[in-house]
Amino acid sequence: MNNSNNGVEWWLIRHGVTAWNLQRKYQGHSDEELLPGEASGLTPLRSKLAGQSFAGVYCSDLKRCRQTLQLIRPDWTGQAVYDPRLREMNFGAWEGKTYEMLEHNPLYRAWIDDPKLHTPPEGESWELFQNRITDFQRELLQKSKELAVSGNGNPSILLIVTHGGVMSTLNMLMSPDADFWDSKVLPGEIMKLKLRSNELGW
């Protein structure tokens, strides 16, 4: 393929601040709302994204991500794809709890030491979590390939509003040298992954 200059970028957004973020509670699939107004921490991001063109927008179907999209780009709320695969890991019985509340639980300690081998009670295994993110990534790569082929030489940007664990997984999948724990993205922050057709073997 000769159009290697037709870059595609994934702009990954972590949802804004919730009360549980401040209380350092596991949220997972719990449908928590953002803090109101400036407390959500999204004002700088809203300014940064104002007027930016996107080739597509994807969003976790959980309330805190929907509200984030509504605040940062309300013009896209009706066109975005709301995908449950973009949810955070399901922490099961540990949701709503803090590290301090769980630190003496033997299963929790084992999970902290090796989350690939242990699963939260009533929660989601590491394998299931990784598999659904990988499934989404494959579809997004196909979309990116189509954008690269049809592009005019300018980067096409896909916006993904999601959660910290999902962002870490996508970064790990797209960056061979990256580890899941390398990404430390705070609520309301952005991570940009720049793809090139020649880098992906298209």
Each model region followed by its residue ranges:
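Domain-level recognition of soluble alpha/beta enzyme cores
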Residues: 175-202
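Active-site-proximal alpha-helix that buttresses catalytic centers in soluble enzyme cores
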Residues: 8, 13, 17-76
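Active-site signature of alpha/beta-hydrolase-fold catalytic machinery across serine-
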Residues: 71, 169-173
